[in-house]
Amino acid sequence: MLSRPKPGESEVDLLRFQSQFLAAGATPAVQLVKKGSRRAGDANLEQPPLQDHRDVVMLDSLPDLPPALVPAPPKRARPSPGHLLPEHEDPEERLHRHDQHITAVLTKIIERDTSSMPVNLPVSSGVAFPPVFHRSQGRQGKPVTAGKRSIFAQEIAARRASGAKVSPVREVESILDPPESAMTCEALTPREWGSQPPWNSYSFQGPHLVTGKGLKGQEAEQEAQTIHEENVARLQALAPEEILQEQQRLLAQLDPSLVAFLKSHSCTREQAEEKATREQRPGRPSAEVIGKEAIAPTSASVPRQENELEPETPALALPVTPQKEWLHMDTVELEKLHWTQDLPPLRRQQTQERMQARFSLQGELLAPDMDLPTHLGLHHHGEEAERAGYSLQELFHLTRSQVSQQRALALHVLAQVIGRAQAGEFGDRLVGSVLHLLLDAGFLFLLRFSLDDRVDGVIAAAVRALRALLVAPGDEELLDSTFSWYHGALMFALMPSQEDKEDEDEDEEPPAEKAKTKSPEEGNRPPSDLARHDIIKGLLATNLLPRLRYVLEVTCPGPSVVLDILTVLIRLARHSLESATRVLECPRLVETVVREFLPTSWSPMGSGPTSSLHRVPCAPAMKLLRVLASASRNIAARLLSGFDLRSRLSRFIAEDPQDLALPLEEAETLSTEAFRLWAVAASYGLGSDLYRELYPVLMQALQDVPKELSSPPPRPLAVQRIASLLTLLTQLTLAAGHIAPEHNSHSAEASLLAGSSSVTWTQVSGLQPLVEPCLRQTLKLLPRPEMWSALGPVPTACLLFLDAYYQAWSQQPGLCPEDWLQDMERLSEGLLLPLLKHPSLGSLWDSLGCCSPLCNPQSCAVAPETISSLASLGCAGGHPPLSLAGSASPFPFLTALLSLLNTLGRIHKGLCGQLATVLAAPGLQDYFLRCVAPVAALHLTPFSAWALRHEYHLQYLALTLAQRAATLQPPMSGTDAALCHGMALALLGRLLPGSEHLAHELMLSCVFRLEFLPERASGGPEAADFSDRLSLGSGGDLGCGRGALLAQACQDLPSIRSCYLTHCSLARASLLASQALYRGELQRVPALLLPVPKEPLLPTDWPFLPLIQLYHRASDTPSGLPPADTVGTALRALQWVLVLESWRPRALWAVSPAARLARLMCVFLVDSELFRETPIQRLVAALLARLCQPEVLSNLNLDCPLPGLTSFPDLYANFLEHFEAVSFGDHLFGALILLPLQRRFSVTLRLALFGEHVGALRALGLPLTQLPVSLECYTAPPEDNLALLQLYFRALVTGALRPRWCPVLYAVAVAHVNSFIFSQDPNNSDEIKAACRSMLQKTWLLTDEGLRQHLLHYKLPNSALPEGFELYPQLPPLRQQYLQKLRISGVLPNGVSDT
């Protein structure tokens, strides 16, 4: 920087300074601007605009110039923009120039600069409400001039006068704090709110102190802007300490009273301006709670920063002036008035730290930076008071308030939060689960305590929150809409599948006994412990049911509370048989529900909302009874006999919904639930006596069905009512077809089934002519998908009724079979066969894959908020149309159609071939191919179990129809038969609890059906060739080839089936209950509530199940004697496994190769003689050969956990002990010992043999030519475990490992020892190098010339040679050099020959 001239410097020095300045090229401090003439206006075009950046609106769509209608006069010159025209210019030309077109105004609109204009905001008060007018103020003020002015007008005039007095002071305030006053008074546009610079950057928008008043036009603005820029530059150059010093100096020069007065008024006005600005500020868009970006601080943080700069802040002035007449106002307690201040400004998040979630009163998640007005009631005085919304912690705190309204509000908000969380509205915006957080915080017992409140509003809010927690939205709607499906009334218990040990021990008891007896451990466990595993069990342990009964019976709550309580009771009844029993046995609970909400007489109701539901029929009350009756046969009988449900069913069914004194929607729902309750009772064979009384009503309702269906479009409630009516008639028809058993069979069963059905066949025989026209009418809408979807389950219910009708007709002993056979032919020719050829039916088959849970697992995705201790179907978001539960699902109709076709084919065998043509549909074939393909097991959730059960029904019925056709008709094609067999195998391993009858029937009819094995005539040659190549001691006998074994297995299929029916038998009680359900034996049905599906009925390795059971029986038998028929069981199991390995490898895809190897080893561990049987030897050898194929061997992983085993090394240790004890050198046994010793498997297995069971080496006499895998699998890569190498060398040197005893492992040990003693890797540790030299020295000094020759001259493995490896005729040069180097260093002695 150049210095100023000093005294004594001459002009020469100044010229030198000038030359240096010009040479440096620096910017001069002063710029000379020549003021041009009028015509030189272009010189100022490049100057920056004086105003700030403002909104500019450009209308590009308008043309810049108007259409040239009249030619404009030629221009004489081009004037500059700032040049004034001379006086003699033509006015018309001036008008044309300045007013050409609308585009001159609208193409560019610039916002007016308001930065320098003062904004006078209204003076705000510091209190929440306007001050009270005191008469003393009238005496202190000026006398009123006009007598007619009101007090309000006088007060307004006084405020205006006081505002006029304060306004001149604002210019002085700007001197003290220009940035704050400027930014506070400026109204920013919404776009500028996010880009406002921070205060500490000293970036001001324009001059506000110097206005340039007194100068001309543009010169005033230019000079003011120049002075402002110089001021800003000086401020930016100053350090914060210098700014404080200047501020102190300025304050010292002014009067202290003036400074205090100005600051007190400035603070009051700034607070009012900030409050007004916040109210006008638009809300920011929602943002996530996590993952926030760093945001620059806004102008709202200015007061805090400036307060830090000020050395001391004067006390705030009171909003009112205390008078001496007022009491206790002599001392002002400001800390007690702190809550009346305005909220602090919203701090925007500077980092990506997670913030506490806050919710609105409607349960909505609020973004952390959302600035909401205070009148919404979302601001409070807790932590982060400037943020709107309530956190979960604050809501929990509010539930303990002494004010009942606050408790009710908190529970209401929590209920809304739970509902939105279950609906998946929060998504990934929250870290973790809201429901898990609430339950861990004790929300469940908070609700239970709130139910004991004395305030009705709190009880109502607690009941609503309890419903939101327990009842998942959409679950009941789904179950109601599928009630009329094939076995749609059956439902899995909605209880957690992951239970503690006490609950698992109870599963062994029958369901009825479990409901009555409760273990003392569970009775003594606290509710909190029970709720951690099962929420509903924990709630029931807190006496929830008596409290709900008290609320219903005594407090008489409003309609919404009644509906919530009934919905909660329905959810409790769906939990389990025990919960349903407790609901039934709760004193006066069911009586209250029946008496208050199912009366037989009531006052007529209007169409509007009602104030009370007591003494008014309610559909949820009827539904509660239906769900209770579904839990067990005993509960249904107690409900019918103890609560006079017959009269109530008659009351609500005998009268049309339009005639009931109820709203139409409620009347139809109530009638539908009455039909469903009767249908559930009829499923047990109960309530049939009502049929005679209500027969005319049912016939009339059935005759009205075509009229209801003809009204386009059908109403959903009417459709559900029709479907429920048809389901009721289906169950009554099955009851009519039931034949009472003879009393001389079993006394217990005879006494149980003594009361036979009171419905006879003649009473239901007239229903079929009325139902069949309804089916024909609905099938006409099949080509119209939108109308077909609107029909819902009506076509399905019609098909199921015809199925039950013909099934019951064929069971009548006194009727002529020719009648029903002819009627079946009529139905088949007139309705079913044309339907099977209809193109629209083909589209339904084609959509099976899209709607299948197996083919489309995403349709069974887990709900957003899933709790392990509370089971739910997770239907909050609904289901897409193309899903099993969707409106366009083909599963219900096609399942009912296949059920009817099976019944007709079973009764009339002549129709089976014609009806089986449905199996040739391309859509069904493609669906089977996708289901047979190996896929990962679907995770079982309550919804996936429910959906898979309905899908398995369709697959089972299609396979049953195929089996009937294959038995009666000519043989099926090989491709179709193999596909059906693969589908049957896949289905057998997937069936869930409750389908025991289906699994039993599959094993009886489809799985072991010879017609489904078309490969029986073509699989022999290939298997024989492979067996000859890998024969293990067979001597080349072609009779033991795999082809002969498979042929023998096909002949023994009946014996194989008997073996698996014995060893894969299911629980007898469950099997009998399932048979009664699927066969329509209503008198034997125990319950419609299925057990919890924890896993499929059969394990994935069910083909090996007989072998596993033999192994466990042998382990549990203390005497060591083998079980009876051990050889036969093992033989049949191995035969079936060989069939599957050869012809159905996909059936064993879920069983890993390591698990298959472990199961084969179990055959040798059963006893000491089983593996010596020749058939067992041949089958195990064939299976071992299949396991040693390259594509299977590459997937053999012995380190992965195996089902049923603690670890494979433990099994292998037992296998070695058994081999030492009983093998006697058996080659097949030895092959299984050698297979896990490959180099790529764990070294633990090789250490177990060479370390603990070295004596077994003498019995491992398996020849190299019979080794099932390549020898290179054992020798490569070189062994790197020093302990194992030392064991190899010790076994070789001591003679425990000899080529004539164990040729395979001898070659392996020689290869690894040779590679180790000649290894020269420089990266080896000193220990490895020392062990290598020691082993080589000992090898050099061996007296056994043969072993020494093998260890030194080993070349590479070769199983064709007797030794198993090739030798160098003489040492290679590298080995000779290495030996010479060691000989020179003294490691090897001299005088010993190298050859």
Swiss-Prot record:
Predominant location category: nucleus
Cellular compartment(s): Nucleus
Short name of one Pfam family: RPAP1_C
Ranges annotated as biased composition (Pro residues): 64-74
Region (Disordered): 34-53, 62-96, 269-312, 498-530
Cross-referenced InterPro entries: RNA_pol_II_AP1_C (IPR013929), RNA_pol_II_AP1_N (IPR013930), RPAP1/Rba50 (IPR039913)
Transmembrane feature ranges: none
Gene Ontology terms: biological process: transcription by RNA polymerase II
Gene Ontology molecular function: DNA binding; nucleotidyltransferase activity
Keyword terms: DNA-binding, DNA-directed RNA polymerase, Nucleotidyltransferase, Nucleus, Phosphoprotein, Transcription, Transferase
Biased composition (Basic and acidic residues): 85-96, 269-282, 511-530
GO cellular component terms, A-Z: DNA-directed RNA polymerase complex; nucleus
Regions of compositional bias (Acidic residues) in chain numbering: 500-510
Post-translational modification Phosphothreonine, affected residues: 321
Recorded family membership: Belongs to the RPAP1 family.
Job description of the protein: Forms an interface between the RNA polymerase II enzyme and chaperone/scaffolding protein, suggesting that it is required to connect RNA polymerase II to regulators of protein complex formation. Required for interaction of the RNA polymerase II complex with acetylated histone H3.
Subunit structure: Part of an RNA polymerase II complex that contains POLR2A, POLR2B, POLR2C, POLR2D, POLR2E, POLR2F, POLR2G, POLR2H, POLR2I, POLR2J, POLR2K, POLR2L, RPAP1, FCP1 plus the general transcription factors TFIIB and TFIIF.
Protein known as: RNA polymerase II-associated protein 1
Phylogenetic lineage: Eukaryota, Metazoa, Chordata, Craniata, Vertebrata
